[in-house]
Amino acid sequence: MNTKILSKDKDPMGAAILDYQKSGRAGRLRVLSSMFEEDEMPVKHLFRKVEEMPMLEQKALQLTKGRILDIGAGSGCHTLALQEKGLEVKAIDISPLSCEAMKLRGVKDAECINLFDPHLSSGNHSEEHQKTLSEENQKQFEGGFDTILLLMNGTGIAGKIENLPALFLRLKALLNPGGQILIDSSDLKYIYENEDGSFDINLNGAYYGEVDYQMIYKDVKGDRFDWLYVDFPLLKSIAETCGLHGELVAEGEHYDYLARIF
């Protein structure tokens, strides 16, 4: 699992986001994969407003509560929507260019930091320290989150199915008591579906939701990276091995879904 920060010369999506933020337009953001034909991500889509978001994203925003952590925030579209509702949101991304764009857009708390960086912590303190704090300051320094958002295929950052438990345990450590994780993904089995409704999936091979991608923007070429799509039953099962519960909140039109983990 990637635990680093992107360098600017290896950050095509960040470059595209910052270009669009500064000029209102951007070039082609190319998406390559060994599994699919070359595709293109519309940069304007990364700046969508609430009413332009897919139903699953809108539902996730409706379910947020308390102090929120938006992971892989990109251009900050989800964070800004929540800020407008008066909610406290911390946006993080491993792209320094995306974080620069977020700040230009008005995101109040945007930090270029990796989710697994120990400096991003729940902020839990010893009982002795907590006793020295007023009730208001305890809340301020507690540092945990009531809602953690991972949208636009939030399971992707795990990269491989074997890394999903580590991701869930890290998120669990960042949650306040009673907190929740809102995460979306897709079941890629439709790629292997036959006309008769059966599926040609190699059960002895790698998990079928493991994909590799590479992005290119102008002369900025990113490194190839692993990206994970997970079917809900497996996501729920892995969450349970981590001492968490998984709940299917809503399903989209094409094997995509929103889950709540708590």
Regions found by a protein language model. Give the residues of each.
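Conserved SAM/SAH-binding beta-strand->alpha-helix loop
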Residues: 95-96
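A short acidic, Gly/Pro-enriched loop at the edge of an enzyme's catalytic core
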Residues: 121-125, 139-148
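Conserved SAM-binding strand-loop segment of SAM-dependent methyltransferases
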Residues: 106-119
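A short glycine-rich, Lys/Arg-flanked "PGG" loop and its adjoining helix->strand segment in the class I
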Residues: 164-177
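SAM-dependent methyltransferase
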Residues: 177-236
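Conserved alpha-helix/loop element of class I SAM-dependent methyltransferases that forms part
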Residues: 48-67
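N-terminal auxiliary segments of SAM/dcSAM-dependent transferases
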Residues: 1-31
